[in-house]
A protein has these predicted regions:
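Serine-hydrolase catalytic machinery in alpha/beta-hydrolase-like enzymes
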Residues: 53-55, 60-135
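Catalytic active-site module of serine/aspartate enzymes centered on a nucleophile-bearing elbow/loop
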Residues: 234-252
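Bacterial N-terminal signal peptides that target proteins for export
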Residues: 1-9
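Primarily recognizes the serine-hydrolase "nucleophile elbow" in alpha/beta-hydrolase
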Residues: 133-191
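N-terminal cap/lid segment of alpha/beta-hydrolase-fold proteins
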Residues: 24-62
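The feature captures the conserved acid-bearing segment of alpha/beta-hydrolase catalytic domains
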Residues: 168-234
Length: 252
């Protein structure tokens, strides 16, 4: 009986693979951020702006201060979104742009990947500008709060004028996984005119700590105005540090 079934089984497999071969096209690859978009699709604050999945929350009360654009590191969206309630109390609408896996894979110093880097920079800058413009109300401040590699790329884009400078910039554990790129980033941050709050976790990972130290040293050397570095004992300190800094800037 088994011998009789074997030819039928082989014939069936041959038809299956023959059909696939005739199709001549492989199954389309799932985009790297496909599952991320699916994870956030059902959230109450999830919406679409310009056909892109974002998280958006309006400010509390009648006092509107501006728009806080949140740029989380890869797989850190939930962590950064926790700041929404505190920012809303200050009068900020909050807009979170879901990160791209490319931001952790690409390095500005990698000459062999320059085309991919240029394409990513252009796409990232366009997303930030376009989605931010769609949600910013007239007369409000634009606050850019970026984390990890998103922070490094955002500061890099602002310095190269590919991204219009916000009214203020908050970096949270900003870094590239390359010392040369971090040194270049430190000079760019020091030379930029945008007011910058540079937050980093005191017990954080090696790359963010090295990158933060480079920015502090370069900003002191350049006598950068409106630059404030601060070591966080805990991420829960972040809202209070942002509020104190905005008070210093005269926003609240």
């Amino acid at each position: 009986m088994a011998r009789a079934l074997l030819p039928l089984l082989l014939l069936s497999l041959g038809c299956l693979y023959g059909g696939l071969a005739q199709a001549g096209e492989p199954a389309p690859l799932v985009p790297p951020d496909y599952w991320q978009n699916g994870d956030w699709q059902g959230m109450p604050d999830s919406t679409q702006v310009d056909k892109q999945r974002v998280l958006f929350a309006r400010h509390d009360g009648d006092s509107y201060l501006g728009l806080a654009i949140l740029l989380p590191d890869w797989q850190r969206s939930g962590q950064l979104w926790q700041l929404t309630r505190d920012l809303g109390r200050l009068g900020f609408d909050t807009l979170l742009l879901l990160p791209s896996p490319q931001q952790t894979e690409l390095d500005p110093a990698a000459e062999k990947k320059q085309q991919a880097i240029d394409d990513f920079r252009k796409q990232f800058a366009t997303r930030i500008s376009k989605l931010g413009d769609a949600k910013l109300q007239e007369g409000g401040f634009r606050l850019l709060l970026a984390q990890g590699t998103s922070a490094a790329w955002a500061a890099n884009l602002i310095a190269s004028e590919q991204l219009p400078a916000p009214d203020a910039l908050v970096l949270l554990d900003g870094f590239f996984p390359n010392q040369q790129s971090n040194q270049t980033l430190a000079k760019q941050v020091a030379q930029a005119s945008v007011p910058t709050l540079d937050l980093y976790q005191e017990e954080g990972s090696t790359w963010p700590l090295l990158a933060a130290e480079a920015r502090k040293s370069e900003s002191r050397r350049s006598h950068k105005l409106n630059y404030r570095p601060y070591a966080l004992m805990d991420l829960d300190e972040t809202p209070g540090r942002i509020q104190g800094w905005l008070t210093h800037l005269g926003w609240i």
